[in-house]
Swiss-Prot record:
Heterodimer of ArnE and ArnF. Residues 40-109 form the EamA domain. One of its GO terms (cellular component) is plasma membrane. The gene is arnE. It comes from Shigella flexneri. GO terms for biological process: lipid A biosynthetic process; lipopolysaccharide biosynthetic process. Keywords: Cell inner membrane, Cell membrane, Lipid A biosynthesis, Lipid biosynthesis, Lipid metabolism, Lipopolysaccharide biosynthesis, Membrane, Transmembrane, Transmembrane helix, Transport. Pathway: Bacterial outer membrane biogenesis; lipopolysaccharide biosynthesis. This is Probable 4-amino-4-deoxy-L-arabinose-phosphoundecaprenol flippase subunit ArnE. The chain crosses the membrane at residues 36-56, 61-81, 88-108. It is found in: Cell inner membrane.
Length: 111
């Protein structure tokens, strides 16, 4: 159950980062303030909830194991950036993502 909490904390953290990115996207000048307030408000909510879940994780998992698992954030953000904003990702970046996933598998198998 705690591993599910860790994944959910990671996803909420990523959602917060993506909301921050969305807040920076261009909108018409007359809608800009509402746009920024909405997306930054959502970012704060996601990041706040992620922090509370993260504290639960830290109570149950050694920090040396839990913290590296947050590198999943790099994977989620890359996938979301490609899907949502059609951002280009170089082969070198994909190689880095693969190494991150490999590292998480290695760390996860030691628990």
């Amino acid at each position: 159950m705690i591993w599910l909490t860790l994944v959910f904390a990671s996803l909420l953290s990523v959602a917060g980062q993506l909301c921050q990115k969305q807040a920076t996207c261009f909108v018409a000048i007359n809608k800009r303030r509402k746009h920024i307030v909405l997306w930054l408000g959502l970012a704060l909510a996601c990041l706040g909830l992620a922090m509370m879940l993260w504290l639960l994780v830290l109570q149950n998992v050694p920090v040396g194991i839990a913290y590296p698992m947050l590198s999943l954030n790099f994977v989620w953000v890359t996938l979301a950036a490609v899907k949502l904003w059609h951002e280009p990702v170089s082969p070198r970046h994909w190689c880095g993502v693969a190494f991150i996933i490999g590292g998480i598998v290695i760390l996860g198998s030691t628990v």
